[in-house]
Amino acid sequence: MAVNYLSEILKILHRKPCSQAELCQQLSLSKSHIHSLVSNLITPGLVEKVEQTEYNQEQGRPRQNLQITHNLHYCSVLIVHHSWEFKAYLLAYGVTEEIASKELKQVNTVELFIKEIREVIDEFAELYLPEREAIKAITVATQATIEQGSSGMMYRNNLLSDENVPLAKMMFDAIGIRTFIYNYAYGHMLTLLHAPSLNTENAMALSCGEGSVALGVFLDKKMLLGRNNSFPECSHLPFKYGFEKSLGIYGPHTQEALMFAICAIAPIYNINHVIVAGSCFDEHLDIIYKVQQELKRQSDPLLHNLVIEYRGLEIEQHLNELIYLSFDALVEVLNPQIQKRSLQDLVKGYDGF
C-alpha cells in the first residue's frame, strides 16, 4: 500500500511542531516534495505556519515551524477504559485540552459498553457541538488482547466478558462513527518510545502494575507489533509462578519473573537495554538493582552487559499519547489527498498576478 505522506506529516505534527527541513529528514523526502505536500495541508486549513519564538537575530528572519491548526469542525471522542476508570473525552482536532469529559459507569458486557459510549456521544453533541457529524472518529484505549486500529478485533478483555468480537465494527454499526481500538498500555509504550531522554534504538520495555504486564520491543526507534497491529501478549510466557501474577503486582516471585523475562526475550532481538516501568516497582527499586547484579554474573556477554533503567509512570504524558492517537485516527478518517491544481490556479499563486 502506498504511503499517504500527507497523513504522515500530520501524525508527526500532532506530537510536536517542526520545520519543513525537519520533515525532510524524518520522512527522507526532498525539499520540493515536502513543500508541495505542506501546501496541500495549508490550503484546506489543517496546518499553519508560525514563527519560532526563540531565534538569533543575527541569522536574519526567524525560522517558521508548521503546526496543526485548531479545528472545531473536526472532533473526536477518546474513551479511556481500565479497572480504575471508564471516561470519555471530547476533543477538537489539534487541541490536547478536552472540550468536555465525563465519567462512565463500569459495565461487564460489550453491549452495555457500547450503550454507555453511544449515550455520552449524543450528550456531547447536544451540549457542545453544532451537529453530531462534527465527531469524525472514536478512539478506545482498553485493557484487552486486540488487533489495534480500525480492525479492532478483540479476543479478550480484562473488564468485559465477551470474547472474540469485532469491537470496532460493532461500535460503528451501533453509533455510526468510525472506531479505532488500542490496548491501554500502548499509550504508555508510546510515552517511552517518544521520551527524548530514553535510548529506544535497541530496547525492550516492561510496564508492570495494577495486575497486568505490558511488553514493548523497540528497534531503530520503532515499536514491534504483531499481525494486524496486535499488541504483544506476554501474559502467556511460561513462568512457573504465573508471569502476569508475579509482575503485575509485587510479590515473592517478582525478582525471578523479571530475570526470566529479560533472559527469555533480550537474546532473541540482541537487545542491550531494558526499560522497567510501572507501579509494581515504585517502592521496590532494590529488585531492579538485584536483577542488574544477577545479570552481571552471567557468562553470556549480551546478558552481562545489558543495562536496566527504571522509569516512573508518567500519567499526564500517557494521556497525551492517547490524545495523539485519537488525532491519528481522525486523520485516517479525513484521509487527506493531493489536490490537482489547474494552470490558472498555479498562476494565481504567484505574486504579481
Mark where each language-model region is:
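ATP-binding/phosphotransfer module of carbohydrate and carboxylate kinases, centering on a glycine-rich
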Residues: 1-50, 55-99, 109-126, 130, ...
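Glycine-rich phosphate-binding loop and adjoining helix at the ATP-binding site
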Residues: 23, 99-191, 195, 286-298
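Short, high-confidence coil segments that cap the C-terminus of an alpha-helix
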Residues: 29, 135, 198-201, 271
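Short coil/turn motifs at beta-sheet boundaries
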Residues: 59-61, 133, 199, 208
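Short glycine-aspartate micro-motif
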Residues: 65, 74-79, 135-139, 203-207, ...
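Glycine/GP-enriched mid-protein hinge/lid loop-to-helix segment characteristic of carbohydrate kinases
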Residues: 101, 170-266, 350-353
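Short glycine-rich anion-binding loops that position phosphate/pyrophosphate groups of nucleotides
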Residues: 143-145, 211-212, 280
